């Protein structure tokens, strides 16, 4: 993410940026005195100049000003997740922000925005019950498996992939008594590490 953030920061019109990339989202938070120009360069960076027959730009969304801050706060609080209140996203945003900070591609505006959003996200999580119950895609998947297959104690399970969601799912399966947890991944070393 550091290198991608530096590439985006070097695009015309982009003054500061933070790149958030998870298994479920890719978001670019950027600051610019020329937002339309910067957005066009960011889209071209990802899509190329020849966008072809399919208008890929229609699959992107954009927020500006207070709407962008509101979106970031919804992301941090788990309101904009596949599983309402999921907890992993807060740490993922924090990592993305610190990566950008360490790379020197943020400044006062980005720093102030993210600090304010972290405060709001924490407040929403601590003052509401949004985090009650299953709060990750992995834990919801395990609950669904229990509804379909019954007790998971002693079962053998194959997890596809070795990313963070697979790690969370593996922990949830182990906690429910699954004994044979196998991992299939394109990288053998990462699969072994997770197993």
What is each residue range found by the language model?
Residues 54-153:
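Glycine/serine-rich phosphate-binding loop and adjoining beta1-alpha1 elements at the start
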Residues 46-48, 56, 110-111, 186-188:
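Short, surface-exposed, polar/charged, turn-prone segments marking secondary-structure boundaries
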Residues 6, 44, 70, 91, ...:
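Solvent-exposed alpha-helical segments within well-ordered globular domains of core cellular machineries
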């Amino acid at each position: 993410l550091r290198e991608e953030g530096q590439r985006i920061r070097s695009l015309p019109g982009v003054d500061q940026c933070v790149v958030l990339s998870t298994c479920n989202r890719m978001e670019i938070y950027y600051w610019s005195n020329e937002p339309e120009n910067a957005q066009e360069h960011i889209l071209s960076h990802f899509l190329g100049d020849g966008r072809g027959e399919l208008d890929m730009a229609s699959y992107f969304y954009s927020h500006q000003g207070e709407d962008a801050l509101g979106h970031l706060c919804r992301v941090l609080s788990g309101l904009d997740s596949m599983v309402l209140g999921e907890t992993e996203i807060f740490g993922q945003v924090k990592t993305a922000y610190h990566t950008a900070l360490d790379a020197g591609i943020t400044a006062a505006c980005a720093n102030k925005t993210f600090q304010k959003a972290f405060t709001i996200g924490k407040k929403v999580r601590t003052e509401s019950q949004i985090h009650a119950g299953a709060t990750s895609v992995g834990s919801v998947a395990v609950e669904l498996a229990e509804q379909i297959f019954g007790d998971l104690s002693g079962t053998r399970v194959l997890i596809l992939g070795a990313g963070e969601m697979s790690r969370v799912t593996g922990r949830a399966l182990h906690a429910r008594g699954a004994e044979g947890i196998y991992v299939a991944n394109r990288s053998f070393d990462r699969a072994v590490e997770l197993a």
